[in-house]
Amino acid sequence: MPSLWREILLESLLGCVSWSLYHDLGPMIYYFPLQTLELTGLEGFSIAFLSPIFLTITPFWKLVNKKWMLTLLRIITIGSIASFQAPNAKLRLMVLALGVSSSLIVQAVTWWSGSHLQRYLRIWGFILGQIVLVVLRIWYTSLNPIWSYQMSNKVILTLSAIATLDRIGTDGDCSKPEEKKTGEVATGMASRPNWLLAGAAFGSLVFLTHWVFGEVSLVSRWAVSGHPHPGPDPNPFGGAVLLCLASGLMLPSCLWFRGTGLIWWVTGTASAAGLLYLHTWAAAVSGCVFAIFTASMWPQTLGHLINSGTNPGKTMTIAMIFYLLEIFFCAWCTAFKFVPGGVYARERSDVLLGTMMLIIGLNMLFGPKKNLDLLLQTKNSSKVLFRKSEKYMKLFLWLLVGVGLLGLGLRHKAYERKLGKVAPTKEVSAAIWPFRFGYDNEGWSSLERSAHLLNETGADFITILESDASKPYMGNNDLTMWLGEKLGFYTDFGPSTRYHTWGIMALSRYPIVKSEHHLLPSPEGEIAPAITLTVNISGKLVDFVVTHFGNHEDDLDRKLQAIAVSKLLKSSSNQVIFLGYITSAPGSRDYLQLTEHGNVKDIDSTDHDRWCEYIMYRGLIRLGYARISHAELSDSEIQMAKFRIPDDPTNYRDNQKVVIDHREVSEKIHFNPRFGSYKEGHNYENNHHFHMNTPKYFL
């Protein structure tokens, strides 16, 4: 039936939009404290999630059930997609918050009002909307196309507007719920779930899905370890996660499935623990089982939600309170240094995950045993339509899975073609850059511009700091995978996202032979990550040590971290490059700890105007050193160095003479002239240019 297909497609599109709005409000709020490293007050916009509380007011409930008001709310919801076109981040945040609040009210009204078939299609549209979203993110290499590109934002806005206009035409019956027979009402009242538990379970399930399955690469990033056994790569392993999510949604329709039993809950809890505590493939397999469990909870949890009472205000408000508490707690686990009460949430993702599993389990075990389909299929006259709707939704679901798998396959093939396309060389260039999670200083996505900038540097090895944006309050974006595929580099994600660091990644034009992830001593401040790597550069093995120390005020942390990294440097091979963010001045205690006890040399010991980024080395011949201004793309510059790998690492002479005229050195070791020429002092212009008395060359 074409009309059923249309209903499913339109509701799924609108469900995808709702998920996208909810996913983006967190990163937009988080952007502002990211700039100041403290709470700004704009966190208050999170109350947009609590808009269902107005539905507890009877006159307001009657008002939003009127067609003209529901039409207005639908238009506001879809219009908030255009927040991406706003001239500044604050206006974008305000428009987005308005869209989130409107979307939640629309969902509450339409889920609790209308015919059983209408409600069934709307609710399943929301569930399938999550699958639509992850499939879109596959095709956009983990990014949400609504919030990443102008063209895709406009296309989805247009399609959503068309869908909304169509829905407005069907909203006339929303204020007239389908009547239930007397026996059905009595049975429903007797088996009605607790509204408080139903709301808490729904909010927890929304956040759990957002946190762990908001993008199919996330499971791999929870399970990741160092090379040569890093665990499954997100592409193609993300396809397994997608298949498991789809399979989980189908499970409740199987007659043999006991989705309300204690055994299934124990299975889900064990898989959650496996994802949190196991490593590489064991963690990834646990994540797949957890995906099946999580998806299988959706029909039952939503069935309990809409059957918990006639007025959705209380239930939806409780749901969103739990969602907010959980996403804030998730942020507190990593940002504990900068927020009140952070000491109690430090690295306690286990408490968060355990609490959510307990809430979902209680709702599963003590609520009605009927799922969403059975609760809404009450009229004999509509059973045929329900069966057809279920059939079409299954077909649509597996069509989405096929589209997602195709996207992964095409991306994987394109990425494989890019890797290893380099000529043999004895020179290597390395760069370090604090990335700010892929957002520029104005709050917009910086990925495309950043990839272009990094490509223009010509660096062979790049370490990116502040790179773990896979967390829900930063957009669930896999920046390592995105940059690796865009630039054609081998990648190392760094310590798992479950270890509560801000992230550090490595990108290499040459194969990574082995690597090891480290969590440096951090008794007082934020968790400091490091990676040690060995890279095969045209048959020569060169070690790299990359790190991000804690903040300047955490003196003990920096002292212990410098000691730990100096040991890593000392134990590295004779040829090693250090790229670090150490928040200490040249000649300071931590600087000397690295150079003297780590047995490395500063690329330019005469550069005294540094504070954070440093490049050091041993066993190589230095050729050049450059600093490139950030031009508001981040809050920090790019530093680069060029080296030659000596033929005999035990018998060579390092370059000592410093020159600033590029004409005095071979053209093949020149830095890209696109960044201008030697410049004294800081470059205050809004362009990427050499500055701070660089570039320098060594003879």
Curated annotation (Swiss-Prot):
Topology class, membrane: Multi-pass membrane protein
Q: Which GO terms describe its biological process?
A: brain development; cell adhesion; cerebrospinal fluid circulation; cilium organization; GPI anchor biosynthetic process; membrane protein ectodomain proteolysis; neuromuscular process controlling balance; peptide secretion
Q: Where are the transmembrane segments?
A: 13-33, 41-61, 93-113, 123-143, 196-216, 237-257, 273-293, 316-336, 349-369, 390-410
Known glycosylation sites: 455
* InterPro entries to which the protein is assigned, alphabetical: Endo/exonu/phosph_ase_sf, GPI-anchor_lipid_remodeler, PGAP2IP_TM_1nd, PGAP2IP_TM_2nd
- Mostly located where? membrane
Q: Where in the cell is it found?
A: Membrane
Cite a single Pfam family from the UniProt record.
Answer: Exo_endo_phos_PGAP2IP
Q: Note down the stretches annotated as region Required for function in lipid remodeling.
A: 607-627
Please provide, in alphabetical order, the Gene Ontology terms of the cellular component aspect for this entry. endoplasmic reticulum; extracellular region; membrane
Q: Which UniProt keywords apply?
A: Glycoprotein, GPI-anchor biosynthesis, Membrane, Transmembrane, Transmembrane helix
Role according to the record: Involved in lipid remodeling during GPI-anchor maturation.
The record describes its quaternary structure and partners as: Interacts with PGAP2/FRAG1.
> What's the family?
Belongs to the PGAP2IP family.
Q: What is this protein called?
A: PGAP2-interacting protein
Record the organism: Homo sapiens
